[in-house]
């Protein structure tokens, strides 16, 4: 702050040589405009990718995923798995400290995994860790994690953004308020959180990786309106913005000071239908609604071409994803099916969205118009993060008002189980996880469970295909599109990326 005041004084005096020197040491402060607000800074208690992405400012895990969603070591050096698949032994890096000076060691890992795997803590990400039987600190750099049953995707759970290492001293000090007081091993530490406006983080001078971070601060600013985010880039109010309004992508691409990036994605957009409620308990109704939506037109209208029509319930870039013949747009067929289902004049329903940004609202409007053409009157509501948490994620089947729900999912572990189980397994109805269709099929449950007990790729392929075949046939969803991730940044900002799961990679970020 003193540096900035000193610089402005020199400008006022008009001392050119001093001005040049001060510019050379100008603070590297970056503003990132994002599409919605943050729910918490505790990764274990965040259901949304954005909150977990911002938490990466402070936190790191034992493992992580690179830009290709491949596993990489972070705070861990290596791991081994026992022959029975029940025990994971992890070797840790030495000499790392948390931002409060506490040592990072095996005891810290145990404290975090004990907290995460204890149902009494009621953490939203508990389901990721409920298979942990016990965690033991063998010595300061060795952790042994024993599972209740074999879980072949467990190492990907340890790479999930939720599996952050929090200072055990901070956990002891702040308890349930840790979401407001993040203390990790990451490159930045908390400066300010104005819960209605921004999160600002500043360089952690004791960061363990030499020469990093290169930025002095990052301000994460929620901006719901797509056009405002784009305008902030053009005026220099922000140096990075995501998501970029698709209709403005071409305009931004012409700006010589801005670089536009369209990245591969594992973000699947869909509409779930509550199959426990009429009329969505009728398979013919669900089939009709799939015929009622013109997906190629939706790609153009809402996504300006930056998406592809969905060909399954798992994005193609996820291992073991199955592709099917896309649903054709056939409103005549849709009306015939509705008549056979006992709804010759259609019906009225509600369609909620998990987000309220401009693209989500376009999807709602487009879908509302498409449904109207087959006699379905849908009242639409675009929710903010607080509404979504209260009305969708926080209510069970009996209390839920969810009927049709437009949302998206990215399997942040990079593997098939997390692309399927949270969304279709019977035990994962809200408020447990995100099966907002309240879908239940015993065969699907069995196939998903069996797939986690084998490390044989051929057997996994068979089991995941069998599960997806049933889900596709029973249609608890209207699969819509797989997005392309469109972001933009100032050309002098380097090393700042969007991950395929819509998270951020910014450890090497710098302002030139």
Curated annotation (Swiss-Prot):
Its main location: periplasm. SUPFAM superfamilies: Periplasmic binding protein-like II (SSF53850). It holds the Pfam family SBP_bac_5. GO terms for biological process: dipeptide transport. One of its GO terms (molecular function) is peptide transmembrane transporter activity. It is found in: Periplasm. The complex is composed of two ATP-binding proteins (GsiA), two transmembrane proteins (GsiC and GsiD) and a solute-binding protein (GsiB). Belongs to the bacterial solute-binding protein 5 family. This is Glutathione-binding protein GsiB. It comes from Escherichia coli O6:K15:H31 (strain 536 / UPEC). The lineage of its organism: Bacteria, Pseudomonadati, Pseudomonadota, Gammaproteobacteria, Enterobacterales.
